[in-house]
């Protein structure tokens, strides 16, 4: 299993916010009654696309990656932000997986053609997207022979 780096669909603009820490961490802090100030950078909203590959041929010959492993991987990807909430990640969530499968172990089409068949676009009447609902995700109606795509949420 290989995954590329995620890229934002639209440009993202980090915003700097000031934070104040009021928690007393040591006895000395309690005596001084100090607070700490700092800065934090956030991205108010971003929709990211990540692409990945699984080689059925390598799974059979080398790694032993199985359908059970794939099911476990999908569960982990879907829940990767659910069990590790953090102010740093806000409300990050996996929204959709589009999975292409080949009839042939070596593949029926190059990966780039399949990635190109998936389009993510901001809706025309939206200037600043602040929700997944502001985007349209489409998969081409015509795929290479021997390839199927399934949309999983």
Regions found by a protein language model. Give the residues of each.
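Basic polyanion-binding and macromolecular-assembly surfaces
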Residues: 1-153
């Amino acid at each position: 299993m290989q995954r590329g780096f995620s890229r934002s669909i639209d440009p993202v603009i980090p915003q700097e916010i000031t934070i104040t820490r009021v928690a007393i961490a040591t006895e000395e802090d309690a005596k001084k009654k100090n607070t700490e100030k700092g800065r934090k950078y956030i991205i108010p909203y971003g929709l990211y696309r990540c692409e990945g590959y699984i080689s059925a041929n390598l799974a059979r010959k080398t790694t032993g990656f199985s359908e059970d492993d794939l099911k476990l991987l999908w569960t982990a990807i879907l829940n990767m932000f659910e069990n590790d909430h953090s102010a740093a990640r806000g409300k990050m969530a996996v929204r959709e997986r589009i999975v292409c499968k080949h009839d042939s172990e070596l593949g029926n089409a190059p990966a780039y053609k399949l990635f190109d068949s998936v389009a993510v676009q901001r809706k025309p009447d939206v200037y600043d997207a602040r929700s997944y609902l502001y985007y349209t995700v489409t998969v081409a109606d015509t795929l290479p022979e021997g390839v199927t795509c399934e949309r999983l949420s």
